[in-house]
Amino acid sequence: THEMQIVKDIANRVAVMQNGKLIEEGSVLDIFTNPQNELTQDFITTATGITEAMVKINQQKIVQDLPADSVLAHLKYAGTVTDTAIINDIYKQYQVSANILHANIEILDNVPVGEMVVILSGNAENLASAQSNLQAAGVELKVLKGGI
């Protein structure tokens, strides 16, 4: 992960190799926000620290006993979506609150790139609308766990 920090700081293009063969190449921004190859995806997941964070998050009581009106979600976003207060907006529009359990934002090639793990809470209809709104705004949203 230390080496990846150096790559993020000084490079604008990156190539990923496995067993002496090129498996993926692109801009640092593209590789970190949309890795295509499974090995690259695993590498980026490790380099961003989300794997380690998820181990700790899944041990939290609030996650283990997730309320029925809640979902645990992983949000990834880049570029202009960071220009708006998306978490505040879903609360104002849909009365869906977000409990931020993990967040990270970096600047890659002068573009803000972020990810969060949140518990979104609200009534079922509003929760679905808020999720759709986030996705329409350009947020990649993956529900990791639904409330029981």
Please annotate each region the language model reported.
Residues 29-33:
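Short acidic-hydrophobic catalytic motif
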Residues 45-121, 128, 143-148:
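ABC ATPase nucleotide-binding domains
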Residues 89, 129-138:
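Short amphipathic alpha-helices in soluble, non-transmembrane regions
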Residues 7-11:
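A short, surface-exposed alpha-helical micro-motif characterized by mixed small hydrophobic
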Residues 17:
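Catalytic metal- and UDP-sugar-binding loop of GT-A-like glycosyltransferases, i.e.
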Residues 1-2:
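H-loop/switch region of ABC-family ATPase nucleotide-binding domains
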Residues 13, 25:
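Short, glycine/charged-rich "phosphate-handling" switch motifs in NTP-dependent
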